[in-house]
């Protein structure tokens, strides 16, 4: 077989770093071009299970609870679209070595600086390679952030972000025709970040750290160019790095389908690791941040629920979905979360802890519908206080002019002079909606401090407290009567459903509930999946009733 002398002369086009090699035999002459490009990080799924989409994160098992959040973790090969090309030309001066192997034997090496349209070989080194025709070779390139140890290439953790190694096999032609050898220099390390995911917009940026929970994070790896594999040489604990993340940028309310899935995100910075690193062995410590009601501070002990090993050039997000942890009133009069009280029975959801106000998880009368007042009163005002039907900010008709549903139900002075019989409307059958709320009893019964407590028909103000707390309606909104208030309606519903209660949004017919506010007749609240509004209705209409309680 005739040997050819391949003389390496690096030339470059606008988008490639190409080494043009002239094959100068006695009777023939051909060219072989080596094309070296650098790769961006890739979506490399090293896990066998299927990817968990946003809408299915709901089913992940709870890992821990921090403040008012139920936390799970899940790793994904990062699917964020990178607008850059998958590979790019080397435009800044970068030192590379190219080794050529025939089988397990190194038969040549080139070394120099690539930049723009030029290749400058290292002083005292050759720019020529002797290669056989019609022979298969393995080409390996690596930059100066990779250390050579014999044939093996070593990378330390400190260089995980910048070290690059490329590998390609190529068979030379037998007829001297021109061919292209493409080598893609890939990251020898991988990158990992945290992605906090919430069911509503994030209201306070996160301050946190990223560290390991074990001392077995690879700190040095060896790459075998012949087997194309990495081996861990040493391990240690991963020193804590800053992991702060910003407010979410998704549109309020719609960004999560009004609380239906964790669509609001706060991504931390990238942390660079070596191949073979297990994301299961990382943790996050949060000192500040807020999604729901409270500041979040605590430890997330592992960023993957099970082993998840990263690969070289991979990019990964440790997703941290956070659900709200609601506060419930239990049948014995105590309050707390469901997880902390597994043997207790919830009877109501706390909607304002300062006022000790809670809404029953069940409907009065098992979902029966009631009129606001008896037909004999017609459309005459039976309440001592009437909310006018003019436009006004919510602060005027709720806080300034608002009243307590407890008073409306149990205080005789809230009834007008035309009320016949008992002026306490909660005890007067002429006011079926009031009467149903006042005589509501949870199906599990009550004990302890709840014995003797009175349930009542909530006012519009009481309902407003509920939608602010459970649906995260913003108090800063200034809207008039009949105007809808945006809310995370599915988070509002979740509070009742998680405790086994009856949701408000059962169907189109049952989204309307009576309030005790007399607004040009009977006042009602309309609860939608995306919003709520407060308005009036003729008192002989029939709607459902949800009882509230002061515990």
Q: Residue ranges of each PLM-predicted region?
A:
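Sec-dependent bacterial lipoprotein signal peptides
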Residues: 1-16
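Residues within well-ordered beta-strands of beta-sheet-rich folds
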Residues: 140-142, 193-195, 358-360, 454-456, ...
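Active-site-proximal beta-strand/loop segments in catalytic clefts of secreted hydrolases
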Residues: 37-39, 359-364, 458-463, 516-518
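Extracellular adhesion/carbohydrate-recognition regions
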Residues: 317-443, 451, 537-548
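Sec-type signal peptide cleavage vicinity
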Residues: 12-326, 346, 378-416
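Mature exported/compartmentalized surface modules and terminal targeting/interaction regions
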Residues: 301, 306-328, 508-510, 516-538, ...
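Residues that flank catalytic or metal-binding motifs in active/ligand-binding sites
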Residues: 94, 188-190, 353-355, 453, ...
């Amino acid at each position: 077989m005739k040997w050819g002398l391949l003389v390496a002369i690096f030339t470059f086009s606008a988008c490639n770093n190409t080494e043009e090699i002239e094959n100068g035999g006695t009777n023939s002459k051909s060219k072989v071009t080596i094309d070296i490009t650098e790769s961006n990080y890739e979506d490399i799924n090293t896990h066998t299970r299927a990817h968990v989409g946003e809408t299915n994160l709901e089913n992940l098992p709870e890992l821990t609870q921090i403040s008012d959040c139920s936390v799970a973790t899940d790793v994904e090969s990062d699917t964020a679209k990178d607008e850059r090309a998958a590979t790019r030309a080397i435009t800044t001066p970068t030192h590379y070595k190219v080794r050529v192997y025939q089988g397990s034997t190194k038969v040549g090496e080139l070394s120099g600086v690539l930049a723009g349209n030029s290749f400058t070989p290292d002083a005292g080194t050759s720019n020529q390679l002797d290669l056989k025709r019609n022979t298969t070779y393995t080409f390996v390139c690596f930059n100066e952030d990779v250390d050579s140890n014999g044939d093996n290439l070593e990378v330390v953790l400190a260089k995980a972000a910048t070290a690059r190694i490329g590998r390609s096999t190529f068979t030379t032609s037998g007829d001297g025709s021109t061919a292209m050898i493409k080598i893609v220099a890939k990251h020898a390390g991988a990158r990992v970040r945290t992605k906090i995911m919430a069911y509503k917009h994030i209201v306070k940026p996160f301050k946190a750290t990223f560290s390991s929970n074990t001392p077995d994070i690879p700190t040095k790896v060896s790459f075998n160019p012949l087997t194309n594999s990495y081996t861990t040489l040493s391990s240690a604990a991963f020193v804590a790095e800053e992991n702060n993340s910003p407010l979410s940028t998704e549109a309020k309310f719609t960004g999560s389908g009004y609380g239906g899935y964790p669509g609001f995100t706060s991504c931390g910075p990238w942390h660079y690791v070596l191949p073979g690193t297990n994301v299961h062995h990382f943790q996050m410590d949060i000192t500040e941040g807020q999604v729901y009601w409270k500041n979040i501070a605590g430890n997330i002990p592992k960023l993957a629920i099970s082993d998840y090993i990263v690969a070289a050039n991979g990019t990964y997000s440790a997703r941290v979905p956070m659900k709200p942890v609601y506060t419930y009133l239990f049948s014995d009069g105590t309050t707390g979360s469901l997880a902390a009280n597994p043997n207790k029975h919830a009877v109501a959801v706390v909607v304002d802890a300062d006022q000790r106000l809670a809404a029953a998880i069940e409907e009065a009368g098992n979902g029966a519908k009631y009129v606001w007042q008896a037909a004999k009163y017609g459309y005459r005002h039976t309440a001592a206080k009437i909310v006018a039907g003019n436009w006004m900010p919510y602060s005027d008709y709720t806080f300034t002019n608002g009243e307590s549903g407890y008073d409306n139900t149990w205080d005789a002075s809230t009834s007008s002079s035309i009320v016949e019989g008992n002026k306490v409307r909660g005890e007067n059958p002429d006011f079926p909606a009031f009467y149903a709320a006042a005589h509501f009893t949870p199906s599990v019964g009550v004990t302890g401090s709840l014995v003797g407590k009175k349930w009542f028909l909530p006012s519009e103000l009481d309902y407003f407290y509920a939608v602010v707390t459970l649906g995260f309606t913003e108090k800063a909104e200034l809207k008039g009567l009949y105007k809808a208030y945006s809310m995370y309606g599915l988070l509002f519903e979740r509070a009742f459903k998680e405790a086994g209660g009856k949701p408000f949004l059962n169907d189109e017919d049952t989204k309307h509930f009576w309030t005790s506010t007399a607004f040009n007749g009977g006042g009602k609240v309309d609860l939608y999946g995306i919003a709520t509004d407060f308005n009036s209705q003729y008192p002989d209409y029939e709607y459902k009733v949800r009882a509230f309680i002061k515990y």
